[in-house]
A protein has these predicted regions:
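Residues in the short beta-alpha loop(s) of Rossmann-like NAD(P)-binding domains
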Residues: 58, 217, 292, 319
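Glycine-rich phosphate-binding loop of nucleotide-binding enzymes
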Residues: 1-81
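Short hydrophobic alpha-helical runs that function as membrane-insertion/retention elements
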Residues: 52-55, 77-82, 285-289, 313-317
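Charge-patterned, long linear interaction tracts outside catalytic cores
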Residues: 15, 19-29, 41, 131-168, ...
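Short helix/loop capping segments that flank catalytic or ligand/cofactor-binding pockets
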Residues: 5-8, 15-18, 35, 63, ...
């Protein structure tokens, strides 16, 4: 009908019991208007006070981030781009007060297991248990001796010198088959001082996301790096989880674009489950955005950890996936009515208006197709069309970096 609608897809459905979590799963092929819709969604959440952390692989949110930075006079809108000169690093053992709750200890253990094992390696109960004990014992050590700097380096030294000796002296010996500590130390050596990734887990300045409400991590440059990509993604998620625990009564949103692939291995399933559980507990929402149907269909981890924990499903134009749609339908648990709604997207759009349609389903109870139609200035802020993006950036450069003014001027010319 073209009538603007106010749509609440987080709180009202939760109050009414339509959904049991605020997480969202977004699927749309390239060119379906996915990035555009997400920019529109994210801006509205941000304007209503939400703290947003984005993990992106394609500069989709650069324009919006820059607008927010200018609007807040540099107070907000932080854009981290991962480069070799400026890598993202953090300290998993950092706390303000030496307080490590069970969840914090678990997340450290999961991070270490991820660094140690390849995606195909099975983690045994003994390995998980021993590493958990080592983390516990190290935490007791740094609490007792405040001269030890809590970081990965001092943990590695504790593991190599003290924990290994303690293992050998035990009455009941742990066999190498059950827990090969030497193999672990060799594998983790690259993250210890002098190793090629020694910067990653020994940061002296922690990533402080607490005061910033809009933060983008652009990790495109390492998405093909099988070693770095999962670690950096976990580091960012850890920073987000720390923020969630400390910020009470405020909505927190973690949006992971294609970077979810770094987490779709069997070893990561536990971490994802933990993350989703924590998000729900602290008034947060996790949003996974993807265009890779093959990856979703073939990954049991995605189904169990991501889709089953996302009560809000958002689908854009699926014409590219017509021949795979039965698999998508079964994966997402869609009814035939919902399937018909989704396949009607963009089939009879009004040619006099510029918009793309989107299907939103809530908890398998409510669903409908909506149009994402925005003003010309808003369109120019979000566009991923290269020529339009370049035009906005060029004019902003001429106007001393004022993107908002550049957008206004270009919009006037297009009216």
């Amino acid at each position: 009908s073209g009538r603007p609608l106010h749509l609440d897809i987080s709180d009202e459905p939760m109050k009414k019991g339509i959904i049991t979590n605020r997480n969202k799963f977004v699927l749309g092929g390239s060119g379906s208007g996915k990035s555009f819709f997400m920019n529109h969604l994210v801006r509205q959440y941000w304007e209503q006070g939400t703290h947003v952390v984005l993990v992106d692989t394609g500069n989709s949110y650069q324009g919006l981030c820059e607008l927010i930075r200018r609007k807040t006079k540099g107070e907000d809108g932080v854009y981290f781009t991962y480069t070799e000169e400026h890598p993202i690093s953090f300290n998993p053992f950092y706390t303000d007060d030496y307080y490590f709750d069970v969840e914090k200890k678990d997340s450290i253990k999961t991070l270490l297991l991820t660094l140690w094992k390849t995606e195909d390696d099975k983690i045994t109960k003994t390995e998980s248990g021993e590493l958990g004990s080592a983390v516990n014992a190290y935490i007791e050590r740094i609490r007792a001796d405040r001269n030890i700097v809590p970081c990965f380096d001092s943990f590695y030294e504790y593991l190599r010198d003290d924990y290994r000796r303690e293992l050998e002296e035990r009455e009941i010996r742990v066999s190498r088959e059950d827990f090969n500590i030497d193999n672990m130390l060799i594998t983790l050596r690259q993250y210890y001082k002098g190793g090629r990734y020694d910067f990653l887990l020994n940061s002296r300045a922690n990533i402080d996301l607490l005061s910033k409400r809009f933060v983008v991590f652009e990790v495109d440059s390492i998405k093909e790096n099988k070693e770095l990509f999962p670690v950096v993604t976990i580091i960012i998620m850890e920073a987000f989880i720390n923020k969630m625990r400390r910020l009470k009564g405020v909505r927190k949103q973690l949006i992971v674009e294609e970077a979810w692939k770094a987490l779709s291995t069997a070893n990561m399933a536990e971490y994802l489950r933990y993350m989703y559980k924590t998000v729900r507990k602290y008034y947060g929402e996790a949003i996974v955005v993807t265009q890779e149907v093959e990856d979703i269909i073939s990954s049991p981890v995605v189904k169990e950890a991501i889709i089953n924990n996302s009560d809000c499903k958002i689908l854009l134009d699926q014409r590219k996936f017509m021949n795979r749609f039965d698999a998508i339908q079964s994966l997402l648990g869609l009814t035939d009515k919902e399937k018909a709604q989704i396949l009607s997207i963009n089939q009879s759009n009004d040619p006099s208006r510029k918009y793309k349609e989107v299907w939103i389903g809530l908890g398998g109870v409510q669903s409908a197709v909506y149009a994402t139609e925005v003003s010309v200035p808003e369109y120019l802020a979000y566009t991923t069309e290269e020529t339009e993006k370049v035009e906005v950036q060029r004019l902003a450069g001429e106007l001393g970096g004022d993107m908002e003014l550049a957008i206004r001027q270009l919009a006037e010319g297009k009216r």
